[in-house]
């Protein structure tokens, strides 16, 4: 391929990534668009119940009247009565209606509770992902502390597809121990909320806390969990994650390791992904950066295998493998033009760990192993059975290191519409 043609392709992909980052920042700004002087209104939550509907909560503070809501586009609705709706918009609306039938309940510890968003007390922000922000919250009826992802509904079709994909995957993956569990959902006119189990932190923040490598024994257990989660998604639901990276790998003080954030996951058709979604440049596989035919994406789950390999090199060494890159363009160029990164021989990694990472980072995706082959690798086999006290290691790291976020949680006036 001519250099100029490749540069144009990389520039377009870089522009797409920048646009997605701007959209993500815009969603966060919308979620935090509450000034300290402005009273926070009570969210009105429509609930489905026995085929009918229950009127929203009438709780409101007489001292703090609800301000007029700003006009917003409703999900899947035409802007005028005469605007024809696309089949995709109709499908999005139909999927939302199906999810609406399940909203307004939390199932925690085998118990099902009728609930609404105002039954949750906001304890502060935990972070942000592809689709929105994550808040630490307490369910007032039981005292359970959970994580709640807030995603802004809009008239943007791509954003709405992300929301529905994230919802669809977490709701269906209740039987996988390696995927973060969903307790229930709440849907309002402006937002979608997913209530999930509370995990401790992500692998990216752990790396920052430690300011160095994560031990191989921990990465061994992490690899087993993530490969099995990805294999489950592919085999059970025909889904490719497309955003495997350290910030989407969660750990907790019980030693659990789970995969999260399915906003840009894609459906597989004949085991192939047929749609493009940018994801994160730093972890993107070569075949996604420079496909043979950009108009017809045709990659498979081995793109996620590459992303896992890059993540393992980063976590095992404490450094991102493509160094000194100031732009996405530079990263994408290095991925295509340089040899794949490997685990350094001088850092004392086992032979099977080095071999596993080398297999994941096979540049020719046709020679890169799929999940069934990876699950047979000696590195996976070893850590499937080897006892590793992840819980004690995690607690020790959290106790002896400082959070990379100096602010802890947001100050109360800037929290969203929870009371």
UniProtKB/Swiss-Prot annotation:
Its EC number is 2.7.12.2. Belongs to the protein kinase superfamily. STE Ser/Thr protein kinase family. MAP kinase kinase subfamily. It comes from Homo sapiens (Human). Residues 37-57 are annotated as: D domain. Interacts with isoform 1 of VRK2. Interacts (via its D domain) with its substrates MAPK8/JNK1, MAPK9/JNK2 and MAPK10/JNK3. Interacts (via its DVD domain) with MAP3Ks activators like MAP3K5/ASK1 and MAP3K1/MEKK1. Interacts with MAPK8IP1/JIP1, MAPK8IP2/JIP2 and MAPK8IP3/JIP3 scaffold proteins. Interacts with RASSF7, the interaction promotes phosphorylation. Found in a complex with SH3RF1, RAC1, MAP3K11/MLK3, MAPK8IP1/JIP1 and MAPK8/JNK1. Found in a complex with SH3RF1, RAC2, MAP3K7/TAK1, MAPK8IP1/JIP1, MAPK8/JNK1 and MAPK9/JNK2. The lineage of its organism: Eukaryota, Metazoa, Chordata, Craniata, Vertebrata. GO terms for molecular function: ATP binding; enzyme binding; JUN kinase kinase activity; magnesium ion binding; MAP kinase activity; MAP kinase kinase activity; molecular function activator activity; protein kinase binding. The record marks 44-45, 76-77 as: Cleavage. Its cofactor is Mg(2+). This is Dual specificity mitogen-activated protein kinase kinase 7. GO terms for biological process: apoptotic process; cellular response to interleukin-1; cellular response to lipopolysaccharide; cellular senescence; Fc-epsilon receptor signaling pathway; JNK cascade; positive regulation of DNA-templated transcription; positive regulation of ERK1 and ERK2 cascade. The modification Phosphothreonine is found at residue 275. Activated by phosphorylation on Ser-271 and Thr-275 by MAP kinase kinase kinases (MAP3Ks). GO terms for cellular component: cytoplasm; cytosol; nucleus.
């Amino acid at each position: 391929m001519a250099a100029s043609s490749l540069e144009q392709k990389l520039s377009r992909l870089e522009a797409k990534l920048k646009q997605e980052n701007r959209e993500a920042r815009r969603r966060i700004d919308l979620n935090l668009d509450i000034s300290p002087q402005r009273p926070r209104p009570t969210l009105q939550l429509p609930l489905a119940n026995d085929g009918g509907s229950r009127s929203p909560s009438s709780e409101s503070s007489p001292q703090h009247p609800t301000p007029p809501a700003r006009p917003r586009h409703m999900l899947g609705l035409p802007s005028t009565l005469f605007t024809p709706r696309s089949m995709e918009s109709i499908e999005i609306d139909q999927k939302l209606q199906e999810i609406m039938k399940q909203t307004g309940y939390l199932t925690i510890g085998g118990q099902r509770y009728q609930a609404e968003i105002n039954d949750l007390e906001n304890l502060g922000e935990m972070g942000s992902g592809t689709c929105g922000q994550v808040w630490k919250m307490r369910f007032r009826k039981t005292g359970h502390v959970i994580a709640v992802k807030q995603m802004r509904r809009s008239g943007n079709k791509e954003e709405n597809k992300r929301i529905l994909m994230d919802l669809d995957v977490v709701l269906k993956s209740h039987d996988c121990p390696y995927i973060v569990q969903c307790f229930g959902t709440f849907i309002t006119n402006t937002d979608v909320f997913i209530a999930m189990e509370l995990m401790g932190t992500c692998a990216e923040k752990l790396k920052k806390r430690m300011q160095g490598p994560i031990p191989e024994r921990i990465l061994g257990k992490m690899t087993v969990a993530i490969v099995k989660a990805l294999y489950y998604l592919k085999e059970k639901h025909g889904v490719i994650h497309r955003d495997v990276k350290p910030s989407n790998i969660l750990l907790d003080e019980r030693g659990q390791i789970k995969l999260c954030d399915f906003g840009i996951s894609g459906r597989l058709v004949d085991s192939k992904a047929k749609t493009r979604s940018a994801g994160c440049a730093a972890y993107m596989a070569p075949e996604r950066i420079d496909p043979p035919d950009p108009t017809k994406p045709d990659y498979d789950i081995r793109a996620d295998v590459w992303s896992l390999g890059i993540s393992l090199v980063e976590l095992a060494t404490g450094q991102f493998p493509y160094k000194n890159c100031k732009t996405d363009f530079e990263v994408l160029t290095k991925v295509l033009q340089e040899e794949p990164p490997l685990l350094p021989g001088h850092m004392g990694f086992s032979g099977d760990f080095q071999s596993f990472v080398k297999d994941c980072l096979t540049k020719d995706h046709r020679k890169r192993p799929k999940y069934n082959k990876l699950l047979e690798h000696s590195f996976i086999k070893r850590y499937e059975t080897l006892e590793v006290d992840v819980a004690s290691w995690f607690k020790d790291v959290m106790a002896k290191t400082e959070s990379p976020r100096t602010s802890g949680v947001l100050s109360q006036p800037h929290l969203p519409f929870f009371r």
